[in-house]
Amino acid sequence: MITIFEALERVRVIPVVTLERVEDAVPLARALITGGIRCMEVTFRTLVAAEAIAAIRQECADVLLGAGTVLTVEQAQQAQAAGAQFVVSPGFNPRVVAHCLGHGVPIIPGIASATEIERALEFGISVVKFFPAELLGGTAMMSALARPYTAVRFVPTGGIHLNNLAEYVAHPRVLACGGSWMVPAQSIAAGDFSQVTALSQQTLQIVGVM
């Protein structure tokens, strides 16, 4: 059986989803699947996150499903109980990291510096979220951080879109790229899930070239 990280590397992209309504969760997941992407990260930026994760887990069992913007141990517990298979956080919170590792939940903590990479390595973590990627200097900064830490893989997120995705995916130390360009909030709000499918297909065309 492959690990979560191996599965993410095969997918190459992680749609970062913020849902305002639980009823949008399953149609959105199905739109991504139709577009060829069987992975998504539901953020805890809204109160319906855990319920949305549970709905997707029940109706779309083959989706690789993560919980994002996990800031507290309580949210990590809610994510796991709802069926999330991995956790992503914007920063490095040692309590959240320790909880996830202690309960067998893969976690991708956010880092923005060499110091935070070293903290991750102290916990035995070698896959980190480079966030916010573009504001921190993009692939140039990521390359600079990668050089001293040869075992670390990155999930760059923040400011990535169709026009710069190829540059990130081509980077040898990138495991997968996270972003919301495939799942625009206005399309979800309007129930225009066909747009999500179209953007997913465009994304895979770019990833497939690499």
From Swiss-Prot:
Its main location: cytoplasm. InterPro entries: Aldlse_KDPG_KHG (IPR000887), Aldolase_TIM (IPR013785), KDPG/KHG_AS_1 (IPR031337), KDPG/KHG_AS_2 (IPR031338). Its EC number is 4.1.2.14. It is an enzyme of class 4 (lyase). The active site is at residues 41, 129. It is found in: Cytoplasm. Pyruvate binds at residues 45, 69, 129. Keywords: Carbohydrate metabolism, Cytoplasm, Lyase, Schiff base. Pathway: Carbohydrate acid metabolism; 2-dehydro-3-deoxy-D-gluconate degradation; D-glyceraldehyde 3-phosphate and pyruvate from 2-dehydro-3-deoxy-D-gluconate: step 2/2. One of its GO terms (cellular component) is cytoplasm. It catalyses: 2-dehydro-3-deoxy-6-phospho-D-gluconate = D-glyceraldehyde 3-phosphate + pyruvate. The record marks 157 as: Plays a major role in determining the stereoselectivity. GO terms for molecular function: (R,S)-4-hydroxy-2-oxoglutarate aldolase activity; 2-dehydro-3-deoxy-phosphogluconate aldolase activity. Homotrimer. Belongs to the KHG/KDPG aldolase family. PANTHER family: 2-DEHYDRO-3-DEOXY-6-PHOSPHOGALACTONATE ALDOLASE-RELATED (PTHR30246:SF1), 2-KETO-3-DEOXY-6-PHOSPHOGLUCONATE ALDOLASE (PTHR30246). Catalyzes the reversible, stereospecific retro-aldol cleavage of 2-keto-3-deoxy-6-phosphogluconate (KDPG) to pyruvate and D-glyceraldehyde-3-phosphate. This is 2-dehydro-3-deoxy-phosphogluconate aldolase. It comes from Treponema pallidum (strain Nichols).
